[in-house]
């Protein structure tokens, strides 16, 4: 049992709030709520799932910062820079548990579908992260466009766009439209390439993390592999493909 009133446990709980307290876009949670509404659900019913998805984003960032040896996150030192790698990993693990607890707290009829979606999403994200890390370890800079897009689909697109859209449909007890997955893959890849560009063109104090870190750590990014102009061109192409995939999708769009 937990020691009653142990100040170190209170500190541990506070550390779990570090990244959420720094803010962030809330993109994934907001997209999930919008998808739930578009499918006819009350967005309030989706709030626990949206909160769990934001917890997912935050514990993944804690671990990602360790794996990437990042210096900053959201305008402040990365957690492992403040408390050390072992403590930061443990904090991320606890946040991971909090995510599952948030999902298990509901007895809604869609719970099993949502749990399965989360499990699948986490597995795909881990696969994408492994590819990214493996390329760094191997010093790979011969990655072609197809391999890069396959990596970011797993690492970024699924949990950033595809899963939020599908989860919103699950909360509405509606089968996810396959066009969402098609569009989500395109939008997620565009999101990652924009992030790659921010690392090249952004300023640390604006983007909230160390600019130039990807190049410094030997990461394979779209601008690094194919050039900045090609990055902007691919973003425009991916956005167009996403709009085409979503054409004709019906639902609440106001």
Protein language model features and the residues they cover:
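N-terminal amphipathic/basic leader segments beginning at the initiator methionine
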Residues: 1-3
């Amino acid at each position: 049992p937990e020691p009653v009133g142990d100040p170190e446990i209170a500190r541990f709980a506070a550390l779990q709030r570090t990244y959420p307290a720094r803010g962030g876009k809330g993109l994934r949670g907001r997209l999930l709520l919008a998808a739930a509404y578009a499918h006819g659900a009350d967005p309030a019913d989706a709030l626990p799932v949206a909160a769990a998805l934001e917890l997912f984003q935050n514990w993944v960032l804690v671990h990602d910062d360790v794996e990437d040896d990042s210096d900053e996150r959201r305008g402040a030192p990365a957690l492992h820079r403040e408390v050390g790698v072992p403590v930061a990993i443990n904090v991320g693990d606890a946040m991971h548990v909090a995510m599952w607890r948030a999902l298990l707290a509901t007895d809604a009829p869609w719970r099993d579908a949502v749990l399965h979606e989360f499990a699948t999403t986490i597995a795909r994200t881990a696969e994408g992260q492994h590819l990214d890390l493996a390329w760094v370890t191997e010093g790979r800079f011969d990655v072609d466009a197809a391999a890069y897009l396959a990596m970011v689909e797993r690492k970024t697109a699924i949990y950033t766009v595809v899963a939020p859209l599908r989860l919103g449909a699950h909360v509405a007890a509606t089968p996810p439209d396959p066009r969402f997955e098609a569009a989500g893959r395109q939008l997620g890849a565009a999101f990652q390439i924009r992030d790659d560009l921010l690392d090249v063109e952004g300023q640390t104090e604006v983007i909230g993390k160390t600019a130039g870190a990807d190049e410094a750590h030997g990461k394979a990014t779209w601008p690094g592999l194919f050039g900045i102009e090609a990055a902007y061109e691919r973003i425009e192409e991916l956005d167009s493909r996403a709009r085409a995939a979503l054409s004709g999708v019906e639902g609440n769009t106001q």
